Each structure stands twice: as C-alpha cells, then as structure tokens.
Amino acid sequence: MQPIELSFEFFPPKTQEGVAKLRASRAELKTLSPKFVSVTFGAGGSTQQGTLDTVLEMATEGFEAAPHLSCIGSSKENLRAILSNYREHGIRHIVALRGDLPSGMGEVGELRYASELVAFIRQEHGDWFKIEVAAYPEFHPQSRSPRADLENFTRKVKAGANSAITQYFFNADSYFRFVEEAKKLGVDLPIVPGIMPITNFSQLMRFSDMCGAEVPKWIARRLESFGDNRESIRAFGVDVVTSLCRRLIDEGAPGLHFYTLNGAWASKTICERLGFKSALIAPMPSPRAARRAVFSLPL
C-alpha cells in the first residue's frame, strides 16, 4: 500500500491576531509531517501580497508551500509576474484555479478557465512547477451537468496538471464514483479528497451553500439538534469526519487534504484518531500507522 499523504490548506491572515493564530496552528500541524501546505488566493487576486508573504514565511519554516493562483480577472502579464516571483523565491508547487469573479469586476481576464491557466504555466515555466487542480465529486455549482464538469476536469489534466484536490464532501460514494468516471476518460493522476472538519454548524451550511457541497440531512439535523452546544458539535463533527476519512483511506484514496480555516485542533484530532501520530509524540510509526503519512482547490 502506498503511503497516505496529508496536506493542509490555510488562508492569508489580515490581522496580527490572525497571523499569531496561523503560526500556532501550522506549528501544531507540522508535527504530522505534511507533504505540503497550500495558501489561498483571494478573488481577483485580492490577497496576492498576503498569499506571497504567507507562502514565503512557511517555506522558511521547512514547509513545501503551494500558493493558490486564480486566473479570473487577471491579465497574462500579471500572472507572468506572479509566477516569476514565486520561481525566483524557489517555490515549485502551485494550485491552479479559475477562481470567482469579484463583485463589481467586469473583466474576466485573458484566461477564462483553469485549463488555460495550467497550459499557460506549462508554456511559461515547463516542468518547474508541480501543478494541483481542483476536482468536484458533486460537480461544480456553475457547471451545466456532471458530464460537462468531468470533461472540464479532464481538460485541466491534459493541459499538464500533476494531481488534483477535490472540493469537500461528506458522501464517500460521490468521490469514488468521480474517480472511476475520470479513469474511464483516461485520467490516471492522484485525486486527493478535500476534507472539511465540522466545528460550526452555521458556518458549514453557509460554506456548503456557496460551493455546492451537499451536507446529508442526517448530519445537518444532528448538528442542528445541538443548538449552541459547541462542544457537542465539535465532538460529533470529529466522529463523522474521522469515519469518512477512514473509509476513504481503506478504499484507496491517495491522501487527505484538510481545509483548516487556519485552525489546528479538529484536523489534528482527526488525523491522530486515524493513527497518524505527531512526530513529537511518536517519532517511530506505530503498527497501525505503518501506512503513515508523509502527511503531505478549485475549478
């Protein structure tokens, strides 16, 4: 069995308090030996400098840091400058996304799709960058149909992607079905499931509505029944997501990519329940963690 790779997503903090929180969170998660960490990029490049600063700081701490890069609303000249800057700083990993057009921005930019961005990166920099792209097991909310979404995914792969990270989901069958359908179209790269820890009911429902992720009724009703009992929500959320991850690993998922929201507790608790031990706690892997992680988004 191949090692299971862990990776974690963060976003650029906007306050000094946020900076301190992120530093503490990634210090905790670093003990799980992630393969890489990714850093989001705001709509229309709104967090461009914050993304760069966060990525470079993480790189100095020994992380393989992968900045998100979205093409929507951006010119080729601007994208070329960003990529050159990352390359000059030794960054070799990119998460290539279409991104969302910010409210009030009329221009979509010179590249309209993530597949065009992937092709542009390859044209400009050859194999310098490892390129991640997004996959949608429950299909992208703006897609015409599941088939059209799958075909769009294959275009990103053929343009030169190395691997993919999915939108989060809570139905493992949707992930395995997507992987099988992608294989039928000739896709053979790793498709890593995106994992969203559950710690806040209203936040989860808001995010899921925005990105088109389905929250099963039984999960939503249980979470709703807890009301404002934060402790019960967190405990139930860890149980649900741990069970999901265990099935994904047991049935062949190549890794787990956690959407941390800049927190560490939930992601780390889930990983440890799965048998992935902190390097500071257990330098040698346990028998159960023999598949142990080199614990290493979206359209």
What are these regions (language model features)?
Residues Q2-E5, S33-F36, E61-A65, G90-R92, ...:
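Short, well-ordered coil/turn segments that N-cap beta-strands
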Residues Q16-L29, T51, K76-L83, S145-R155, ...:
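Short, acidic/polar
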Residues G18-V19, G45-E57, S75-A81, L101-I121, ...:
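Active-site-adjacent beta->alpha loops and helix N-cap segments on the catalytic face
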Residues F36-T47, L69-C71, V95-L97, N162-N171, ...:
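Catalytic beta/alpha-barrel core
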